[in-house]
Amino acid sequence: MSLYIGLMSGTSMDGIDAALLELPSNQLIHGITKQYSDDVRRNLDDLIMGNHLTLASICQLNTLIGREFAEAVRQLLIEIKVHPKEIQAIGSHGQTVCHDTSGNIPYTLQLGCGHTISSLTGITVVADFRTRDLVNGGQGAPFAPLYHQQIFSKVNESVAVVNIGGIANVTFIAKNQMTRGWDIGPGNCLMDAWIYKNKGAPFDKSGVWASQGEVIHPLLEYLLQDPFFHLDSPKSIGKEYFSLSWLQKHLKPDYTPADIQATLLALTAHTIAETILNESEEIKQLYLCGGGAHNTHLKENLARLLPGITVKSIAELGISPDYLEAMMFAWLAAQTINQIPVNLTSITGAKGIAILGAVYPIIKSY
């Protein structure tokens, strides 16, 4: 038995998920979510929205996020009463602030200094997972299908798994076939940004506000014409693409805020449903994870758009939808520490297998 910690803050930027994972059983021992401090969240919002930040302030933010990730580890270990020396390594995703693979020089950047995390926790850290995949010709995302493949390793039927974070991504798993996956488009990011702008709430709980509006079909049809939705897979995208500025250039003065929220939920539902329907007629089970798995109105829309396919939360398998990505980075850290390459060729389009991540070691004294 080996213990690893995974740290994840996704494109929703709703906090740091920390998960203690037992391997090789893939059992979640404990998980917590630590909210970002107001200053860090404000600086992250400014950075994502393209507001001016100096190079010095970005460097400081990298260290501050590292400190907050380390504090999440400290809180996790205190709650579960585990000593840092019992942990083999931490897998830290960091906080994505930019990700673009569309040009001749693709790039990705996750903040959260690995040296800071390892020094403050006394635990070896593996971070910067996505860069190696980009260098190997991949999209750098999504990685979730790798771990979904582990969970459904004994699958006897074709299933789809959709992780609905800020960006939604899909995994297709079938017996005796290579696992495939890619980014679909906006998951929660536009809905979260719109309700925050209009109501000051971080997210639309259960999709209640969206359910009070009416879908603006001309707007929905216009949004669905975005070129990203028509790219072939593998493909990936960042939250900075599907931003409020992307949305607002399509809005008209007579649109009500609630109707716009309903339309944004419909956009997420339609792009997910279209992806599932276009892929395979054999898919009969769709499992949801990520924050969107709690959005009742979104699940109802998906069920309506996907007749004959059972839509359920991955929680029905006894797996936490909230900590699945953090668990994945704990698992990825174990692969790196043990020099086990992973195969992302059918997911990100990478050329060949690779060992992901950079290691920030701590010399343990016993």
Swiss-Prot record:
It catalyses: 1,6-anhydro-N-acetyl-beta-muramate + ATP + H2O = N-acetyl-D-muramate 6-phosphate + ADP + H(+). It is an enzyme of class 2 (transferase). Pfam families: AnmK. Keywords: ATP-binding, Carbohydrate metabolism, Kinase, Nucleotide-binding, Transferase. InterPro entries: Anhydro_N_Ac-Mur_kinase, ATPase_NBD. The keyword Transferase applies. ATP binds at residues 10-17. GO terms for biological process: 1,6-anhydro-N-acetyl-beta-muramic acid catabolic process; amino sugar metabolic process; peptidoglycan turnover. Its EC number is 2.7.1.170. Pathway: Amino-sugar metabolism; 1,6-anhydro-N-acetylmuramate degradation; Cell wall biogenesis; peptidoglycan recycling. It comes from the Bacteria. Catalyzes the specific phosphorylation of 1,6-anhydro-N-acetylmuramic acid (anhMurNAc) with the simultaneous cleavage of the 1,6-anhydro ring, generating MurNAc-6-P. Is required for the utilization of anhMurNAc either imported from the medium or derived from its own cell wall murein, and thus plays a role in cell wall recycling. This is Anhydro-N-acetylmuramic acid kinase. It comes from Legionella pneumophila (strain Corby).
